[in-house]
Amino acid sequence: MHVKKGDKVKVLSGKDRGKEGTVLEAFPKNERVLVEGVNMVQKHAKPSQENPQGGILNIEAPIHVSNVLPVDPKSGEPTRVGYEVKDGKKIRIAKKSGEALDK
């Protein structure tokens, strides 16, 4: 998968097209990611220990990984991902600038 938890991404399609956010969680088996502030849905929650009031909550729902691209650290634009081997480790690089995406 071309995005990981903590990556800054831009949404390419769907109702939240153009929005940017951070990947909160990645689900590689389902090819989906949870992006902060994107694809908000309303969840009707019963009263519980954590939420004694209950009611309607706004939470993020996962979106398909093909609808997001990482943001280039140099230019701030969405970029495709390439891979290089440095010091025996495979790292992700931004195709637009050649900058490393992995910290």
Swiss-Prot record:
GO cellular component term, pick one: ribonucleoprotein complex
InterPro entries from the UniProt entry: KOW, Rib_uL2_dom2, Ribosomal_uL24, Ribosomal_uL24_CS, Ribosomal_uL24_KOW, Translation_prot_SH3-like_sf
Keywords: Ribonucleoprotein, Ribosomal protein, RNA-binding, rRNA-binding
RNA-binding among keywords: yes
HAMAP family: Ribosomal_uL24_B (MF_01326_B)
Family: Belongs to the universal ribosomal protein uL24 family.
Protein name as annotated: Large ribosomal subunit protein uL24
Gene field: rplX
